[in-house]
């Protein structure tokens, strides 16, 4: 429900529904990798689609087969330098262990799904981390910056090398827009490779604070290979974006 209400911009109901899950069976695992390496047995996954190596795994388990850069994987979903280089993603963040560098491609790939040969991993649909970040964004937009910061830090801090010194403080954000921007970047980092990005692009197309404006331009693989493009906190160069993958405005007929 929090996901639906967030798309509807019904901030109060997002918070109300999120509160219903507090203190219940679902929690935020202490290690950000746990929902993926322990996909059958963790307390963070609210809803996942099970896969089995003996049950049509070639189709049902296509997620790991297509995304993984490990042996047997097709590595078709690389991590963009736009995300990898983001100032919001610290270099010692534990979630950087969930991206894998493959030298033959000179590229990083999402490594949440690590069994491309057996393809038995569960497909994550909804995790408690999303509930918390949905609540954080809704609270920020509704004017409750204290609650927003609490929920944002709850998700982010578990991945920090030193939460005591690296956690966000209220003084880090000059206004609501800055806080919401941090929450949106946290979503990109936390849900990389889980299919949440498109929904955010769509719902934020005409946003009052941080409009996506449409489908962002994409970086062309051949434009960054052997260019040293992946640098924590590094720049993202305009020439990396290819003509074949240009920005598509929200008004374009292809934007449904």
Please name every model-derived segment:
Residues 67-83:
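Short, cationic low-complexity segments
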Residues 1-63, 87-256:
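Acidic/polar-rich alpha-helix caps and helix-coil junctions
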């Amino acid at each position: 429900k929090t996901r639906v209400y967030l798309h509807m911009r019904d901030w109060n109901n997002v918070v109300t529904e999120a509160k219903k899950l507090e203190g219940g069976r679902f929690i935020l695992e202490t290690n950000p990798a746990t929902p993926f390496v322990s996909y059958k047995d963790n307390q963070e996954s609210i809803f996942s689609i099970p896969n089995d190596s003996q049950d049509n795994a070639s189709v049902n388990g296509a997620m790991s087969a297509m995304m993984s850069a490990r042996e047997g994987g097709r590595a078709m979903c690389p991590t963009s330098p736009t995300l990898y280089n983001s100032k919001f993603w610290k270099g010692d963040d534990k979630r950087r262990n969930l991206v894998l560098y493959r030298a033959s491609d000179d590229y990083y790939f999402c490594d949440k799904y690590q069994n491309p040969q057996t393809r038995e991993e569960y497909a994550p649909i909804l995790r408690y981390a999303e509930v918390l970040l949905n609540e954080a964004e809704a609270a920020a937009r509704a004017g409750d910056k204290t609650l927003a910061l609490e929920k944002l830090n709850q998700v982010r801090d578990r991945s920090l090398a030193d939460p005591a010194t690296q956690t966000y403080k209220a003084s880090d954000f000059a206004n609501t827009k800055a806080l919401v921007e941090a929450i949106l970047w946290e979503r990109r980092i936390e849900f990389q490779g889980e299919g949440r990005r498109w929904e955010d692009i769509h719902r934020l197309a005409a946003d009052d604070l941080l409009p996506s404006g449409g489908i962002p331009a994409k970086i062309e693989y051949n434009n960054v290979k052997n260019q040293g493009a992946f640098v924590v906190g590094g720049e993202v160069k305009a020439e990396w974006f290819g003509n074949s993958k240009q920005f598509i405005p929200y008004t374009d007929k292809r934007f449904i």
